[in-house]
Swiss-Prot record:
Name of the gene this protein is made from: rlmN
CDD domains: Radical_SAM
Pfam entry (one): RlmN_N
Cellular compartment(s): Cytoplasm
The protein's name in its UniProt record: Probable dual-specificity RNA methyltransferase RlmN
Disulfide bonds: 139-372
Residue numbers binding S-adenosyl-L-methionine: 198-199, 230, 253-255, 329
Length: 385
């Protein structure tokens, strides 16, 4: 038997995924019908052969996307015969809650089982505010696993399984909302970050559709400026994102300031070197005039020296960026250390000395492995809250 080495397997996965994000000839496999991945007019078209009026599409859409119901039987203003037929069609596929954990800081992690048995994770982060309304952020997964194999990331270590459908992406927010409204009828997610499991730009079409569903005025109606999509540097995806007619935010997972180090920790850099990624990000800024967010995971003795800070600052000289420093989180089997507070503060001060708008990002949910780089979509080894 010819067994491929892990690096070779990762390269094959990356080549396969590359083909999916090229603007020309992107192919989407036919997906099973799931009402939560459809817009009102699409639901209406689906029901036209049943002799249903057009307004049924908007009616059902609001039940699903605004009220976050999980059962057709809950759509009480639909005719009974239609509810029965919809139920028999099997077009509503809510995520199956596998495990729920709550951190000391109030962060919640949800483990979901998909219809085919795959596991994904989502994170709910409530931020309490005294003067303004509370901010409630959900960190979303876009793939089961991830093909990019970033060395410091738990998701990358488990390999790539498949892309999530738009319904599965949207379903993470809808099913969290459904659960939370049992105790708080006014619960609402206000912000979204596509920073969970997977690379969003390797599932571009489904991410794009999900954003459209999230922002639809008859659904969750989340403001575009309250949504951030993060990429490890998929250049065609960045260019496509820049051409979108929206105000969704872009974040770049950078984590190193030179090609040698970045390729060592992020193999995707071999396909899209740093210069290409930065050129694409500059094109994004020139087209949109929207400030780029940059994520930088600090690893003790790896990329946390003052010379690293100066090199990082030089990459973005004259750019209106916001840089988040993220002291790396513990992931079993990786062997990287989180830097102490003092060198982290020195790194931050050096960046600011060179004119970079930078902060040390507040980390949430570390005690339940819900922080950056810790999501892994696994049922074993976790304790139920």
């Amino acid at each position: 038997m010819n067994v491929k080495e892990p690096a070779e397997e990762a390269a094959i996965q990356l080549r396969t995924e590359r083909q999916r994000i090229e603007p020309e000839g992107e192919e989407q496999s036919e997906q099973p019908t799931d009402l939560r991945g459809l817009f009102p007019e699409e639901i209406a078209a689906l029901l036209t052969p049943w002799g249903q009026p057009t307004f049924r599409g908007k009616q059902i859409f609001k039940w699903l996307q605004n009220r976050a119901v999980r059962e057709v039987a809950e759509m009480t203003d639909l005719p009974q015969a239609l509810r029965v037929r919809l139920g028999e069609a099997g077009w509503l596929k809510p995520l199956a809650p596998e495990r729920h954990r709550v951190a000391r800081d109030g962060t919640e992690k949800y483990l979901w089982r998909l219809a085919d048995g795959e596991l994904i994770e989502s994170v709910l982060m409530p931020y309490r505010r005294a003067q303004t309304r509370d901010r409630v952020t959900v960190c979303l997964s876009t793939q089961a696993g991830c093909p990019l194999s970033c060395r410091f990331c738990a998701t990358g270590r488990q390999g790539f399984r498949r892309n999530l459908t738009a319904a599965e992406i949207v379903g993470q927010v809808l099913d969290i909302t459904h659960e939370k409204r049992k105790d708080d009828p006014d619960f609402k997610v206000t912000n979204l970050v596509f920073m969970g499991m997977g690379e969003p730009f390797l599932n571009y079409d489904n991410v794009r559709r999900a954003i459209g569903l999230f922002t639809h005025p008859e659904g969750q109606a989340i403001g575009q400026r309250r949504i951030t999509v993060s990429t490890a540097g998929i250049v065609p995806g960045i260019d496509r994102f820049a051409d979108e007619d929206w105000e969704v935010n872009l974040a770049l997972s950078l984590h190193a300031a030179d090609d040698k180090q970045r390729s060592e920790w992020m193999p995707v850099n071999d396909r899209f070197p740093l210069a290409q990624v930065l050129e694409a990000c500059r094109r994004y800024w020139e087209k949109t005039r929207r400030r780029l967010s940059v994520e930088y995971a600090l690893m003790a003795g790896v990329n946390d020296r003052l010379e690293d800070a100066r090199r990082l600052a030089s990459l973005f000289k004259g750019w209106p960026i916001h840089l988040n420093l993220i002291p790396v989180n513990a992931v079993a089997g990786i062997g990287v250390r989180r830097p102490e507070r003092e060198p982290t503060e020195r790194f931050l001060a050096e960046l600011r000395r060179w004119g970079v708008d930078a902060v040390i990002r507040e980390e949430r949910g570390q005690d339940i492995e819900a922080a950056c780089g810790q999501l892994r979509g696994a049922a074993k080894g976790e304790e139920e809250a």
